[in-house]
Amino acid sequence: MCQSNQIVSHFLSHRNVTNELAEKISKDHYSYKPAETSMSAEELVKHILTSFHLFANVIKEGNASPFQNKQEETETDLNVLAKTYTEKTVAILEQLTEEQLDREIDLTSAFGRKVTGRALLQLAMEHEIHHKGNLFVYVREMGHTELPFYQQRM
């Protein structure tokens, strides 16, 4: 399996579970927060979906400019967003080159350090996994008991 296929496969092994959890959130639970200081379920899902896409764009561009170009999302259906952002992120990941993954990106303004594309990809994956764990808690507290394993077999 080539590098880009491995990256996409690993991404989807986690994203498909994130999307499955998002499917369990009915619109009347979009505003659910487990604590006053928590993101709402809707905010959390949008954060997960858009963050990986943003990180992938930073790797593709080789600089922090995508952080400056955050677009407000007008779509309100989490399932539509999950499908759209997953497809857009996969399209970027499929095109990443070894050069882009090995290139050092100056992210001192965002993270206080320079990182390689590969290191940022790892950070993006860990960010997804971290927040997916949060999402499991939200969905359980909404009353769902039939939940997927944290990672899908690919």
UniProtKB/Swiss-Prot annotation:
Sites where the protein binds a divalent metal cation: H47, H127, H131
Pfam entry (one): DinB
Entry keyword Transferase: no
Keyword Ribosomal protein tagged: no
InterPro entries assigned: DinB, DinB/YfiT-like
Keywords for this protein: Metal-binding, Phosphoprotein
One term of GO molecular function: metal ion binding
Phosphotyrosine: modified positions: Y150
Subunit-level organization: Homodimer.
Family recorded in the similarity comment: Belongs to the DinB family.
Protein name per its UniProtKB record: Uncharacterized protein YjoA
Lineage: Bacteria, Bacillati, Bacillota, Bacilli, Bacillales
Gene name in the database record: yjoA
